[in-house]
UniProtKB/Swiss-Prot annotation:
Protein function: The steroid hormones and their receptors are involved in the regulation of eukaryotic gene expression and affect cellular proliferation and differentiation in target tissues. Transcriptional activator of several progesteron-dependent promoters in a variety of cell types. Involved in activation of SRC-dependent MAPK signaling on hormone stimulation.
Segments crossing the lipid bilayer: none
Phosphoserine, modified sites: 20, 81, 130, 162, 190, 213, 294, 345, 400, 676
Lineage summary: Eukaryota, Metazoa, Chordata, Craniata, Vertebrata
Motif position, LXXL motif 1: 55-59
Record-level Gene Ontology MF annotations: nuclear steroid receptor activity; sequence-specific DNA binding; steroid binding; zinc ion binding
Chain intervals for the UniProt region annotation (AF2): 687-933
GO cellular component, one term: cytoplasm
Pro residues bias (residue ranges): 418-433
Region called Modulating, Pro-Rich, residue ranges: 1-566
Protein name: Progesterone receptor
Amino acid sequence: MTELKAKGPRAPHVAGGPPSPEVGSPLLCRPAAGPFEGSQTSDTLPEVSAIPISLDGLLFPRLCQGQDLPDEKTQDQQSLSDVEGAYSRAEATRGTGGSSSRPPGKDSGLLDSVLDTLLAPSGPGQSQPSPPACEVTSSWCLFGPELPEDPPAAPATQRVLSPLMSRSGGKTGDSSGTAAAHKVLPRGLSPSRQLLLPASGSPHWSGAPVKPSPQPTAVEVEEEDGSGSEDSAGPLLKGKPRVPGGAAAGGGAAAVPPGAAAGGVGLVPKEDSRFSAPRVALVEQDAPMAPGRSPLATTMMDFIHVPIVPLNHALLAARTRQLLEDESYDGGAGAASAFAPPQSSPSASSTPVAVGDFPDCAYPPDAEPKDNAYPLYGDFQPPALKIKEEEEGAEASARSPGSYLVAGANPAAFPDYPLGPPPQLPPRAPPSRPGEAAVTAAPASASVSSASSPGSTLECILYKAEGAPPQQGQFAPPPCKAPGAGGCLLPRDGLPSTSASAAAAGAAPALYPALGLNGLPQLGYQAAVLKESLQQVYPPYLNYLRPDSEASQSPQYSFESLPQKICLICGDEASGCHYGVLTCGSCKVFFKRAMEGQHNYLCAGRNDCIVDKIRRKNCPACRLRKCCQAGMVLGGRKFKKFNKVRVMRALDAVALPQPVGIPNESQVLSQRFTFSPGQDIQLIPPLIKLLMSIEPDVIYAGHDNSKPDTSSSLLTSLNQLGERQLLSVVKWSKSLPGFRNLHIDDQITLIQYSWMSLMVFGLGWRSYKHVSGQMLYFAPDLILNEQRMKESSFYSLCLTMWQIPQEFVKLQVSQEEFLCMKVLLLLNTIPLEGLRSQTQFEEMRSSYIRELIKAIGLRQKGVVPSSQRFYQLTKLLDNLHDLVKQLHLYCLNTFIQSRALSVEFPEMMSEVIAAQLPKILAGMVKPLLFHKK
């Protein structure tokens, strides 16, 4: 690159050029440009002294001087078009394709006036009047009327500019001495992160003197082969000056970037070659056609926009850190609020920052307050996460600098109004991914060339708003976690940037909820999100997240509505319904073994042991008792197969209600006998009441007690009583449930075989019931005490019959037990060949055995006592066979010797004795015993 010297008093200004950096001076302010008050006409750079530690007094407002520069504007328009042509031709030499559209400028003369001030020689030989500040964008003058000249400052300035302009010779300076001053941000740094530096000591509010700071312009350094700029630039980004948007000669005010209007240097990332080639060719073609301009303005037309302020980089670093760590940022917010860009403008946060010797620290975005400036919007992101590095591409050139201004507005048309307090900002919206092309909602006259490069970003979305989505804007909060949720998951280089396309559409997804005054999500939102998430996992728990008004409408759940699946014996988990009861497998096996093994369990306690899952094996007696009380029957499942109607019809068509009471443990003993499969009739207490109702009335013997007892008269009275009782048995048997279902021959046979047993058993009951077993109560008119028994001829037989009431007294037999035992006596003797209706007989007998067990359970509580009583009662029934046998023998002998003994036998009784007693005594009958002898 050839050596460049400033020959003309003016330098072209490219409208829309992004800001360029100056090493050590990344200061930004409102987009207002003002020339140097004291123009210097020297070929060399101005020599100014270093800025003091404090910035107070450096920036102050300047009144307008009312100067007019019409000739400068005309000359600037012509020179600017020439320079743009040369710049386009120079870009074409890079050999890459692509094109970019540039909007025509609106007021190129005004821009040239600013460039004239920038490139005006500072020597005493040349002097050009500078336009007043009122004819440019603002009436604020950046510096005082006279800047003190400091000779040592010139070499430093030259060292800064020499690598940028590729100057050779002694003006290049020592690059090693300014290595720290050449530090810039990485290539991928977002052009949106400018540093807001308010004037120290005075907030930008209405009525207060405002001292805006200069903003840096855009500088892009492009790498060129064979040039000395690569060695002298140090860590600067290598690039070539470019023009994002040029101003045509048609007139009109071109959009001015903040850096171009306010001063300073900014860094623009390297532009893609496919978009910059036509511009370089245009500049190279028009470069020779720019008379009256300095070589610096011709070649580096986009390099410098406003005067370079040689500020102390150490001061800037200290001031930058102070601004980043300061709690109050009202000055920067006020300065940013003057020209706040539209909410849909993505380029509001797209101005780059050049850092001198700053570390990789965070920079607030352009026109964005500090974290605590607007706490209502809940910006939880720390400053270290507010910087965004983007990939190299054409994003910088795609952003139009006109987006910083109101649409259709001229930056020179803004009058000098005092800055008011910052306006209320819209809620923050999430930015887009880095590397994504930004389509700017700029004025209609400025078209933007966009280039999107694919980039992936990890977005941390932790909240999902249910209401309307927040409005997109430059104050979008970074997607970070809420307070207390830990650090943000996004890396520094993966933070998303504002998406212009989403902002222009205005329909971006709402990713942030409404926040409270403390920056935290409202409780109603948290409950709604929690309730929404619970609908997918745990729906019954939605009642815990409901308003108070819905609390009374929520369904109430209780244990009654849940299915019972526990063992009724021990409380363990039930495996099914075993033997008619819902039990576990352990209790099922225990009950089966206890019933089949005929174990005689005894409780070591008081028959009230606790039977649960842990202690169920401690007391088998109490466990078996509980099984019987629950209703477990060994043949319970087998009995369900038979039809109830058929069995009821078998029981003499007497309707028996189904058992509903709690079964007792006496059912254990019923399984020790051979049951028929048709035993579906379970005799229950109502059946016992039926037996009580069919009990025969009191039968009188017709004995004359006024006469002394003789053997013949006493026996004759007993025979008459027997005849009446036999008729009563026939009548009772016909009313007995199930008996008439048997064959008629079977009915007669059973009555003939059991009539003696029934009469003696009734005698014992009456004796036990009326005289407590002290006498033989044959009838109310025939009661034999011991004295009368001794005087009789059948005293031995009376002693035999007297045993029955004594057993009743001993066992304290109840009426229910007596009624059941009486029925079993009717069914305890059958012929050897069996009965014609043997099956129905067995079913009927088994049913009454179970009824006896129930009758025992009405008084005996516990398995062991019930079993013992069942044994005693059934043993008594077995013993009656021998006793009745003695009566049969005595009756048959008396019947045979009736004439000799002068004893009368009634007709029916005579037929029964003559027909059946010889068979019974001959052993031609089969007694049914409960116990083996």
